[in-house]
């Protein structure tokens, strides 16, 4: 694993410029170095390209997914070296940490693969380079520095709410993508919720000297959140000044300055900024500013827009980029990306107009969800996976679909005989109770919370499948967020609100049991997918 550790031999940056630490970290190597060549393929899934960086235990390659052509970064770790170097527990910890922190301003871990000799971290490829390379050329404009700092605080706050503390925040570990958005990387030294001592503090002495907090130097235990906030303050000072607040070639003198909080603000710092940076670099962790106080500070609030996102099918989507605002309508319009309903075939009648057909390139929305207006068609859009009849039957014990309202872990499924439009409207009504707003894109209808939280969004996915012309299956899943919060939502809001829509068994006209009718159903219509997205507090 590529890591940066505290070492007395490390040369510190001078006040004239911010310099990179001599030992590249894992994430810093993602974009800094070039060179190398093709490395073949990885387990038949990725084609390796040039080497982006390397360290004692790993190399980082640019790579291409063979099926999707997506560009990724793959960190390749040598198993033998990791074992001999005692790094196995750190590798496992990094994997666990990265799976807990899915955020637009954090480099994503897509998957982890392994062979007999190698471990492969497939990660988001960030094209813009390190933030360090930008600040090393001189101080940034105030609005640019503020935007980076806002994104940094958003990511760090998200990590802290999930019990993750980075402990090595520095410009080398902050990447900037092609859109100018900041990405926090390299969680090799991060601490998880299982690493606290009985006193509730962290005791590992780690980090990079110029960015380490005074309480870490005291070696008496420290609050990981407070230590990260200090590092954020050092980074912000460097962005605005063009040099570090604490600097000296003598490591012990440097530590003394940090310990005592000895720094000076240049004359071009505004009063609001000086007030903020002074509180960020407060040597006393007990009086140091907290994240909520940072967000409420005058300097920080200018132009600040909280990040809102959701996770679907293990992929992260930023609502500000991917979701369109739509006013609620009655009847509910079809999701964008679907064709207008196809008329039923002449040889049969469709009782409720929901039995539309589709071909391989056009997906049709049931008529009960249509306003009659044409929608744009995207032939390249992948068709959602449909459940078959046997999947639906297996939802219920004893193959009985009567009054089905079944829970399986984080999933709830029930059968309804009501029109899909009524189900959608009821979901919208329930969402309003939680102050959610409805948004729609492609096959997704997103319901987004308006209250900002500290532990990320509660994400609930609801899919409606057409089972027969008169029956639908509604499947609700927790995609992300705190499980207890999800259960409260289901028990207090979802179940009571949807109970009257649950199907009651009625005798079939020809005496055939409903379960047998379902078995003979050839296929299910493409589902309408709804996302309930919140930004509730205290979620993990």
Swiss-Prot record:
<feature type="compositionally biased region" description="Low complexity">
    <location>
        <begin position="353"/>
        <end position="364"/>
    </location>
</feature>
<keyword id="KW-0808">Transferase</keyword>
<feature type="binding site">
    <location>
        <position position="75"/>
    </location>
    <ligand>
        <name>ATP</name>
    </ligand>
</feature>
<dbReference type="GO" id="GO:0106310">
    <property type="term" value="F:protein serine kinase activity"/>
</dbReference>
<feature type="binding site">
    <location>
        <begin position="52"/>
        <end position="60"/>
    </location>
    <ligand>
        <name>ATP</name>
    </ligand>
</feature>
<dbReference type="InterPro" id="IPR011009">
    <property type="entry name" value="Kinase-like_dom_sf"/>
</dbReference>
<feature type="region of interest" description="Disordered">
    <location>
        <begin position="333"/>
        <end position="380"/>
    </location>
</feature>
<dbReference type="Pfam" id="PF00069">
    <property type="entry name" value="Pkinase"/>
</dbReference>
<keyword id="KW-0464">Manganese</keyword>
<feature type="region of interest" description="PPI">
    <location>
        <begin position="409"/>
        <end position="438"/>
    </location>
</feature>
<dbReference type="InterPro" id="IPR018451">
    <property type="entry name" value="NAF/FISL_domain"/>
</dbReference>
<feature type="compositionally biased region" description="Pro residues">
    <location>
        <begin position="333"/>
        <end position="348"/>
    </location>
</feature>
<dbReference type="Pfam" id="PF03822">
    <property type="entry name" value="NAF"/>
</dbReference>
<protein>
    <recommendedName>
        <fullName>CBL-interacting protein kinase 12</fullName>
        <ecNumber>2.7.11.1</ecNumber>
    </recommendedName>
</protein>
<dbReference type="InterPro" id="IPR017441">
    <property type="entry name" value="Protein_kinase_ATP_BS"/>
</dbReference>
<dbReference type="InterPro" id="IPR000719">
    <property type="entry name" value="Prot_kinase_dom"/>
</dbReference>
<dbReference type="GO" id="GO:0004674">
    <property type="term" value="F:protein serine/threonine kinase activity"/>
</dbReference>
<dbReference type="InterPro" id="IPR008271">
    <property type="entry name" value="Ser/Thr_kinase_AS"/>
</dbReference>
<comment type="function">
    <text>Involved in drought stress tolerance. CIPK serine-threonine protein kinases interact with CBL proteins. Binding of a CBL protein to the regulatory NAF domain of CIPK protein lead to the activation of the kinase in a calcium-dependent manner.</text>
</comment>
<dbReference type="GO" id="GO:0005524">
    <property type="term" value="F:ATP binding"/>
</dbReference>
<keyword id="KW-0418">Kinase</keyword>
<feature type="domain" description="NAF">
    <location>
        <begin position="370"/>
        <end position="406"/>
    </location>
</feature>
<dbReference type="GO" id="GO:0007165">
    <property type="term" value="P:signal transduction"/>
</dbReference>
<feature type="domain" description="Protein kinase">
    <location>
        <begin position="46"/>
        <end position="300"/>
    </location>
</feature>
<feature type="region of interest" description="Activation loop">
    <location>
        <begin position="186"/>
        <end position="215"/>
    </location>
</feature>
<feature type="active site" description="Proton acceptor">
    <location>
        <position position="168"/>
    </location>
</feature>
<dbReference type="InterPro" id="IPR004041">
    <property type="entry name" value="NAF_dom"/>
</dbReference>
<comment type="similarity">
    <text>Belongs to the protein kinase superfamily. CAMK Ser/Thr protein kinase family. SNF1 subfamily.</text>
</comment>
<feature type="region of interest" description="Disordered">
    <location>
        <begin position="1"/>
        <end position="23"/>
    </location>
</feature>
<keyword id="KW-0067">ATP-binding</keyword>
<keyword id="KW-0547">Nucleotide-binding</keyword>
<keyword id="KW-0723">Serine/threonine-protein kinase</keyword>
């Amino acid at each position: 694993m590529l890591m940066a550790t505290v070492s007395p031999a490390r040369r510190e940056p001078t006040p004239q410029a911010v310099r990179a630490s001599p030992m590249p970290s894992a994430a810093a190597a993602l974009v800094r170095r070039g060179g190398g060549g093709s490395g073949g393929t990885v387990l038949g899934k990725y084609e390796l390209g040039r080497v982006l960086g390397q360290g004692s235990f790993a190399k980082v390659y640019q790579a291409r997914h063979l099926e999707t052509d997506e560009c990724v970064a793959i960190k390749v770790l040598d198993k033998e070296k990791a074992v001999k170097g005692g790094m196995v527990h750190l590798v496992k910890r990094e994997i666990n940490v990265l799976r807990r922190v899915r955020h637009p301003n954090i480099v994503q871990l897509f998957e982890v693969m392994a062979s007999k000799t190698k471990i492969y971290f497939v990660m988001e490829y960030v094209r813009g380079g390190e933030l360090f390379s930008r600040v090393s050329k001189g101080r940034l404009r105030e609005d640019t520095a503020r935007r980076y700092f806002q994104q940094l605080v958003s990511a760090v706050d998200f990590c802290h709410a999930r019990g993750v503390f980075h402990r090595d925040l520095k410009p080398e570990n902050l990447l900037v993508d092609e859109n100018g958005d900041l990405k926090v990387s390299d969680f090799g030294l991060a601490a998880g919720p299982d690493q606290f001592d009985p006193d509730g503090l962290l005791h590992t002495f780690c980090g990079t000297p110029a960015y380490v907090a005074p309480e870490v130097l005291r070696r008496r235990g420290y609050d990981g959140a407070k230590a990260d906030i200090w590092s954020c303050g050092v980074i912000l000072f460097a962005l605005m000044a063009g040099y570090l607040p604490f600097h000296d070639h003598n490591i012990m003198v440097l530590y003394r300055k940090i310990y005592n909080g000895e720094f000076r603000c240049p004359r071009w710092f505004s009063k609001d900024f000086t007030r903020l940076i002074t509180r960020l670099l407060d040597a006393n962790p007990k009086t140091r500013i907290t994240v909520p106080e940072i967000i409420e500070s005058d300097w920080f609030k200018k132009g600040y827009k909280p990040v809102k996102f959701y996770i679907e099918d293990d992929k992260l989507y930023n609502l500000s980029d991917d979701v369109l605002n739509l006013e609620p309508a009655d009847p509910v319009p079809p999701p964008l990306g679907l064709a207008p309903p196809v008329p039923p075939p002449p040889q049969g009648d469709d009782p409720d107009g929901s039995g539309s057909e589709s071909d391989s390139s056009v997906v049709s929305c049931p008529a009960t969800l249509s306003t009659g207006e044409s929608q744009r068609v995207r032939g390249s859009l992948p068709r959602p996976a449909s459940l078959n009849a046997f999947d639906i039957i297996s939802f219920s014990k004893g193959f009985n679909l009567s009054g089905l309202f079944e829970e399986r872990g984080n999933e709830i499924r029930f059968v309804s005989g009501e029109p899909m439009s009524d189900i959608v409207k009821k979901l919208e009504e329930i969402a309003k109770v939680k102050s959610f707003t409805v948004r729609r894109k492609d096959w997704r209808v997103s319901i987004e919370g308006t209250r900002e939280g500290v532990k990320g969004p509660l994400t609930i996915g609801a899919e409606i499948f057409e089972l027969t012309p008169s029956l639908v299956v509604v499947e609700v899943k927790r995609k992300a967020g705190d499980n207890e919060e999800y259960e409260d939502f289901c028990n207090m809001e979802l179940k009571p609100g949807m109970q009257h829509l649950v199907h009651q068994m009625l005798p079939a006209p020809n005496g055939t049991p409903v379960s047998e009718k379902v078995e003979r159903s050839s296929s299910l219509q493409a589902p309408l997918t709804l996302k309930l997205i919140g930004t509730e507090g205290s979620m993990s």
